[in-house]
């Protein structure tokens, strides 16, 4: 290599370094901040800013945990849907293609309710993440993993059928929920998730997404994002020790970082919320903080054109540790389990 070529390469390297940094007064490089996320109004899902995650399990009800499900009745689900309509929710997120989701879709159609649906497909563990998940104490047996794969294949088929049967209501399909993050108890290998996404996209007209924590998208999300119509992000400042005064700014920071990592992707928040009771972070959990976080998110998302599915509509007592009634997992609802409103929707 000649001296001229070495000089040219050196100058090129300096140029590339400077392109990613700015200089302060003392000529020390300072990393630039991610570009502020600003989307077009057309990037909103169904033109909606604030949407909500919906699951209808009430006191004493629960999904199948190995001993059968105790599901809400159609009358109870209809009551829930009417509450959501009354509070101006026109877009809800469902998490699986099972019986409750079909009932919900049928009730929306039969009662001509002004609600559209992000339909979820739940993926069970196809890989034993006992070394990464804090609450998996032993490996998942191979036979169970094989059975889960069969369940996932069936779930995808049911989800495709629902999306086509209820194409007037289902406006998008979400394949998997936190099945890729390092701490999940229902991990599915990335290649398998991509295969499911491709199968769904080939069979329906609606846009397809996947829901994962923001950190996963930043670190590992490019191959999957390239397959999707938009990227579904989860972000929970309260779980990450942030006080309410930093709730919105931390959420925006997370979204800006995802945007920097995936600049060609449209983004939506598929879960963000604030628990009103939480033994895990009691000093930050309150109705007032939830109301503020909702209002702050609404204000930012309206300007940035980001659809937000607030987590969640109603408290769900079946979740989390049954011996800890104050556990956060039970208390994310905008409404109590008896369907009375919390602070944001309450006329005090």
Model region roles, listed by residue range:
Residues 181, 185, 235-239, 263-292, ...:
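Active-site clefts of carbohydrate-active enzymes
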């Amino acid at each position: 290599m000649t001296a001229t070529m070495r000089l040219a390469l050196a100058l090129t390297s300096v140029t590339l370094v400077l392109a990613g940094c700015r200089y302060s007064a003392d000529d020390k490089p300072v990393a630039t901040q991610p570009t502020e996320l600003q989307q077009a109004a057309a990037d909103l899902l169904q033109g909606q800013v604030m949407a909500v995650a919906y699951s209808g399990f009430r006191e004493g009800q629960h999904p199948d945990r190995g001993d059968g499900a105790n599901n809400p009745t159609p009358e109870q689900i209809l009551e829930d849907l009417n509450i959501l309509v009354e509070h101006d929710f026109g877009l809800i997120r469902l998490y699986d293609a099972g019986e409750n989701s079909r009932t919900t879709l049928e009730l929306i159609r039969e009662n001509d309710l002004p609600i559209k649906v992000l339909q979820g497909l739940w993926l069970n563990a196809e890989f034993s993440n006992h070394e990464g998940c804090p609450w998996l104490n032993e490996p998942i047996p191979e036979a169970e993993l094989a059975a889960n794969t069969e369940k996932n294949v069936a779930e995808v088929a049911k989800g495709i059928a629902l999306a086509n049967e209820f194409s007037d209501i289902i406006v998008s399909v979400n394949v998997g929920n936190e099945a890729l993050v390092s701490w999940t108890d229902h991990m599915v290998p990335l290649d398998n998730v991509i295969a499911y996404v491709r199968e769904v996209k080939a069979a329906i007209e609606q846009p397809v997404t996947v829901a994962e924590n923001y950190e996963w998208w930043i670190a590992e999300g490019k191959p999957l994002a390239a397959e999707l119509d938009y990227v579904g992000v989860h972000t929970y400042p309260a779980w990450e020790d942030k006080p309410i005064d930093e709730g919105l700014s931390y959420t925006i920071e997370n979204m800006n970082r995802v945007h920097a990592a995936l600049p060609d992707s449209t983004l939506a928040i598929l879960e963000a919320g604030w628990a009103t009771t939480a033994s895990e972070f009691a000093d930050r959990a309150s109705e007032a903080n939830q109301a503020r976080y909702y209002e702050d998110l609404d204000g930012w998302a309206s300007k940035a054109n980001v659809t937000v599915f607030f987590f969640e509509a109603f408290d769900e007592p079946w979740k989390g540790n049954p011996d800890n009634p104050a556990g956060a997992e039970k208390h994310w609802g905008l409404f109590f389990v008896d369907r009375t409103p919390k602070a944001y929707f309450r006329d005090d």
